[in-house]
């Protein structure tokens, strides 16, 4: 970053001579240093998977979750700072509740994503605030079918068939590009998400991690859920076996 230290990174509202907002770049760096997030929009729903890094063996299993419910038909996954992400999760739940109270129906996924994106963007306009150091994958099923959107610190909001964030973003993206999303079921996507996360995990730098999986599909009656233990264990076994086969 050519202008670091020259004053252009002191305020999020200040552009550098080459047209950058360095504090937004720094927020993106926080996302890049997070555990890998992978999301797949299948033909019958959406699957979220997160490589939750475990910095200490004293950490209780299931702590600091990165997959969360927003409404019955909406689930999200987080890459980046959890403290910042909690604010976005709270905001998303409030937006979903207010929309349903006003219009009498569940909020469309695209509308929710755009509202959170606008909230993020607001935090790039004023010197008295800073960008959120996290990106959020928003998924669900509405009247338009399965939906997957990524909302980034800059306030961008983009729909995807498959998406990745975090340390293994590029390697995961390369794997996602090989998938025919329109032919894949959620059960198959759970295995693929697990396989990709295990394949991009860096065992040298990050030895321990927990695999978090969430899904919403016709099989769950269009309700977002944490993947059941039986399916989770089956997917993890498949991922580990695939990794062993690849290393042979």
From Swiss-Prot:
SMART domains given in the database record: Proteasome_A_N
PROSITE patterns from the UniProt entry: PROTEASOME_ALPHA_1, PROTEASOME_ALPHA_2
GO BP field: proteasomal protein catabolic process; proteasome-mediated ubiquitin-dependent protein catabolic process
Record has Cytoplasm as a keyword: yes
Presence of keyword Nucleus: yes
Pfam families: Proteasome, Proteasome_A_N
Keywords of this entry: Cytoplasm, Nucleus, Proteasome
Subcellular location: Cytoplasm; Nucleus
Gene3D superfamilies attached to this UniProt entry: Glutamine Phosphoribosylpyrophosphate, subunit 1, domain 1
Oligomeric and partner information: The 26S proteasome consists of a 20S proteasome core and two 19S regulatory subunits. The 20S proteasome core is composed of 28 subunits that are arranged in four stacked rings, resulting in a barrel-shaped structure. The two end rings are each formed by seven alpha subunits, and the two central rings are each formed by seven beta subunits. The catalytic chamber with the active sites is on the inside of the barrel.
Record family assignment: Belongs to the peptidase T1A family.
Physiological role: The proteasome is a multicatalytic proteinase complex which is characterized by its ability to cleave peptides with Arg, Phe, Tyr, Leu, and Glu adjacent to the leaving group at neutral or slightly basic pH. The proteasome has an ATP-dependent proteolytic activity.
Protein name: Proteasome subunit alpha type-3
Native organism taxonomy: Eukaryota, Amoebozoa, Evosea, Eumycetozoa, Dictyostelia
Gene field: psmA3
């Amino acid at each position: 970053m050519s202008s670091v230290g020259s004053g252009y990174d002191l305020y999020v509202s200040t552009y550098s001579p080459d047209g950058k907002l360095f504090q937004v770049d720094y927020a993106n760096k926080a996302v890049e240093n997070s555990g890998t997030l992978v999301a797949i929009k299948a033909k019958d729903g959406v699957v979220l998977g997160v490589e939750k890094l475990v910095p200490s063996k004293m950490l209780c299993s299931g702590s600091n979750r990165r997959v969360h419910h927003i409404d019955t038909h909406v689930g999200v996954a987080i890459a980046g700072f959890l403290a910042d992400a909690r604010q976005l999760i709270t905001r998303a739940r409030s937006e979903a509740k207010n929309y349903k109270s006003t219009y009498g129906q569940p909020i469309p996924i695209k509308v929710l994503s755009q509202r959170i994106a606008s909230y993020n963007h607001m935090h790039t306009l004023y010197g008295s605030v800073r960008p959120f150091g996290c990106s959020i994958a928003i998924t669900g099923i509405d009247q338009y079918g399965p939906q997957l959107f990524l909302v980034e610190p800059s306030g961008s909001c983009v729909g995807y068939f498959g998406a990745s964030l975090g340390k293994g973003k590029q390697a995961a993206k390369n794997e996602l590009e090989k998938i025919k999303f329109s032919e894949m079921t959620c059960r198959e996507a759970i295995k693929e998400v697990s396989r990709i996360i295990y394949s991009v995990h860096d065992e040298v730098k990050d030895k321990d991690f927990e695999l978090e999986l969430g899904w919403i599909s016709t099989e769950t009656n269009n309700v977002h859920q944490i993947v059941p233990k039986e399916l989770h264990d089956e997917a993890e076994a498949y991922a580990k076996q695939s990794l062993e086969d690849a290393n042979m």
